[in-house]
Amino acid sequence: DIFIRMEYLTCFMEYYAGINLTEKEVMKLGIDLCRSLEYCGQLHIIHRDIKPENIFVSRFGDFKLGDFGIARELEKTMSTLSKKGTYSYMAPEMYRGEQYDSRVDIYALGLVLYKLMNHNRLPFLNLEKQLITYRDKENALTRRMSGETPPPPVDAGEAFGSVILKACAYDAKERYQTPDKFREALEEIRLHGPAQGVHALSRGGGHGIELPEALHQRIQRRCVCHHA
C-alpha cells in the first residue's frame, strides 16, 4: 500500500465565518500569502485565482494558498496567456486581455486584504446596503476596471490602507513589483504597531498574532475529529 501524508487544512471561509478580523490578523494573512507567492515566483508560476475561497488555514493558524487548477508557468512571452480567474479579484490588464505577469497575483491579494478590512466588501460596493445585487457588483467591477481609485478600506489604519491600495493599483507599474516587497511593507507596519481603523475591533496583544477564541475552538474540534 502507498500512503500519502498531507497537511490537514481547512477553508479560510469556513473558519472565519462571522468573525471580524483585526489589522494584525489580516496582516498575518497577507504576510503568509506573500511568502506563498514568493515560492511560486521561484517556480515561475502565476496562481491567477487568488480569492478567499482559495485560502486555507492550518491547525496552527498559518494561512496557505491552494487550488492551483488554473495556475500557469511564466514564459518568456506573455502574449499567449489567457483570461482566467475570478472577475471580482482580477487585475485590469488580465481583464482587458493584455499581456500580464505575476503582478496580477499581487493585485488579487491586495483586493483580498481590502475586502477583509472593508466590512467584507470589495471596492465601490455600498457599505450600508445589507443585500448586494448582481447590478451592484457589475457597477463596482466597471468602476474598478475604468481606473477609478478605490476609497481606503474603512477598517484599516492609514498606513495599512496605503499598503493595500498600492498592492491593488490600477497600473501594474505602481504596485509592489514582487511579493517580497509587498511582504516587507506589511512587516514594517506590523513592527511599528499599526493604528487600528475606526471600525476595527481590538483583540490580542504583544507582537505576535493572537487568533480569535472562536477560531481556536473550531480548529481544536476539527483536529480532534480528524485524528479520531
Set out the residue ranges of the language-model regions.
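Protein kinase catalytic-loop region centered on the HRD/HxD motif
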Residues: 35-45
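Conserved activation segment of eukaryotic-like protein kinases, specifically the C-terminal portion
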Residues: 80-93
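Conserved catalytic-loop aspartate of Hanks-type protein kinases
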Residues: 105
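Activation segment signature within eukaryotic-like protein kinase domains
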Residues: 29-30
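Conserved HRD-motif arginine in the catalytic loop of eukaryotic-like protein kinases
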Residues: 175
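Conserved short submotifs of the Hanks-type protein kinase catalytic core
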Residues: 1-12
